[in-house]
């Protein structure tokens, strides 16, 4: 018997019954039988482009090392954690990070898959990283400057480990 995390629809936002998640994730030798909602989540709302945010967890969410959402300065939110050694605990999850350019200059990372001005974890004047688990587009029209980047071949985007990215686009304030 083991305890595993699941994110509804395997995306940041989305509604899915616990029974649906259990059925979708079960496979021979690993049957999901019991589920509990482990976070508070948005029950309404859309992005500036009209994409639903319903189902988005308020807190930081990491499942099997995959970062769905990481909020900087969100110390008052407790997260239920299943550690890699199987131990369980509930504690605030504080995310922090920085980006170091080839020339050595640095910028603070404000979050992963969060939006600018998100209270209490504001990303103003910080770098936000969006991955393919976000709402399909950043929806941050005019909120900052965006530039597309991809992981360097062989790199993994996972918790508590550095990774390298390569810029593949020009900066833009148009969003997406």
Annotate each language-model stretch with its function:
Residues 1-176:
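Gly/Ser/Thr/Pro-rich low-complexity, intrinsically disordered segments
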């Amino acid at each position: 018997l083991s305890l595993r995390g699941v994110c509804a629809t395997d995306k940041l936002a989305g509604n899915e019954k616990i029974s649906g998640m259990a059925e979708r994730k079960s496979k021979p030798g690993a049957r999901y039988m019991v589920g509990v909602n482990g976070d508070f989540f948005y029950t309404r709302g859309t992005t500036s482009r009209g994409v639903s945010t319903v189902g988005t967890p308020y807190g930081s969410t990491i499942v099997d090392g995959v970062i769905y959402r990481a909020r900087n300065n969100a110390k008052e939110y407790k997260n239920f954690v299943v550690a890699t050694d199987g131990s369980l605990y509930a504690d605030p999850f504080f995310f922090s990070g920085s980006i170091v350019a080839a020339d050595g200059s640095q910028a603070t990372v404000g979050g992963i898959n969060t939006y600018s001005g998100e209270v209490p974890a504001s990303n103003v004047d910080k770098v936000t990283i969006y991955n393919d688990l976000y709402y399909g587009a950043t929806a941050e029209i005019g909120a900052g400057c965006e530039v597309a980047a991809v992981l360097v071949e062989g790199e993994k985007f996972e918790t508590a480990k550095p990774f390298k990215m390569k810029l593949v686009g020009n900066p833009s304030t148009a969003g997406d």
